């Protein structure tokens, strides 16, 4: 079997075990058995448990980002782009629950080196969402200009909400990717639409 195919099998097994048990509780013996190889071969190919976990994080992050980008068309309005991106995001996390568990929860509890990998992925997604919100502001009627700081904050809030919603949706088999995406659009875009049109919530006096 080619080395690349063997490594893919090992990483598939790693994602499943890490996703279910977490980094610290995961056993290289279990990963090797699930992959159908010897434990020494796992170490020969992927060096260490830490390196295997890092490789799993990077692979799953790249796959998620690729899925979201592939799902978005650039020739449609910004709200449709966001809808397409959210649908692709929730479809991917539903189809790869262990991969999402690795990215969203297990990597964050594994320590600084792993957290840094997830932060890099999240920053790329936030940058993508930031560009969509900025585009929506440019497309809007009235006074569409939003401060750069405000756009960045809105993107952070939207991504954080989508991450939380993915965890909820994956815990309920009755929730489809489209339903999760629609929930997110109703929560986020309805408010963003008003904001783009110049309707803002009035901050109360500090008294």
Predicted regions and their residues:
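N-terminal intrinsically disordered/low-complexity leader segments
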Residues: 1-5, 137-146, 196-207
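Helix-turn-helix
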Residues: 9, 13, 17-51, 55
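Short secondary-structure transition hinges
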Residues: 51, 84, 91-128, 141-152, ...
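Histidine- and aromatic-rich ligand-binding microenvironments
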Residues: 52-71
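Hydrophobic alpha-helical connector segments
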Residues: 55, 70-98, 148, 158, ...
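Amphipathic alpha-helical packing segments from all-alpha helical-bundle domains
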Residues: 62-65, 112-139, 149-156, 179-190
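Amphipathic C-terminal alpha-helical segment
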Residues: 91-95, 99, 131, 135, ...
């Amino acid at each position: 079997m080619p080395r690349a195919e063997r490594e893919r099998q090992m990483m598939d097994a790693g994602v499943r075990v890490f996703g279910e048990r977490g980094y610290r509780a995961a056993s290289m013996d279990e990963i090797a058995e699930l992959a159908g190889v010897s434990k020494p071969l796992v170490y020969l190919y992927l060096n260490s448990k830490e390196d295997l976990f890092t490789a799993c994080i990077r692979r799953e992050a790249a796959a998620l980002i690729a899925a979201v980008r592939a799902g978005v068309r650039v020739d449609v309005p910004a709200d449709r782009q966001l809808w397409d991106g959210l649908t692709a995001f929730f479809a991917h996390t539903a189809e790869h629950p262990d991969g999402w568990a690795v990215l969203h929860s297990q990597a964050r509890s594994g320590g600084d080196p792993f957290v840094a990998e997830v932060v890099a992925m999240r920053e790329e997604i936030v940058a993508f969402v930031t560009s969509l919100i900025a585009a929506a502001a440019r497309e809007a009627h009235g006074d569409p200009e939003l401060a750069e700081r405000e756009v960045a904050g809105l993107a952070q809030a939207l991504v954080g909400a989508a991450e939380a919603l993915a965890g909820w949706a994956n815990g309920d088999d009755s929730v489809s990717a489209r339903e999760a995406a629609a929930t997110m659009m109703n929560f986020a875009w309805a408010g963003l639409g008003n904001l783009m049109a110049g309707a803002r919530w009035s901050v109360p006096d500090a008294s």
